[in-house]
Amino acid sequence: MDKFYNYNSSSHQALLSFKVKPNSKQNLISNFVIINNIPYLKLSIKAIPEQGKANEEIINYLAKEWKLSRSNIEIIKGHTHSLKTILIKNINEDYLNWIINSYIK
């Protein structure tokens, strides 16, 4: 099984894979799921998937949850799909590991 994230130490950037469920009761990251032998963090978002509302809420939620600037979070793949790749900029590896370990159960 591959990891659901990759870290580039020279650029201090990370790519994370998410399986997003919009129109949920609450915003929540809950462990991970395997789809076609690929792991994804499960992310529930309250916003509906219309006109970019869910994508905007994903960025807002991750920035608040992880105490990062919104400008350091970017959806780079899956804008109109539930499987998304998100780029996190300006993050050190220790902080990323702390984030990741808080969701692995």
Swiss-Prot record:
* Organism this protein belongs to: Rickettsia peacockii (strain Rustic)
> Which named protein is this?
UPF0235 protein RPR_04990
Q: Which terms in the GO cellular component ontology are assigned?
A: cytoplasm
Q: What SUPFAM superfamilies does its record include? A: YggU-like
The record lists its disulfide bonds as: none
Q: Which PANTHER family match?
A: UPF0235 PROTEIN C15ORF40
**Which SMART domains does the record match to this protein?**
DUF167
User: Which family is annotated?
Assistant: Belongs to the UPF0235 family.
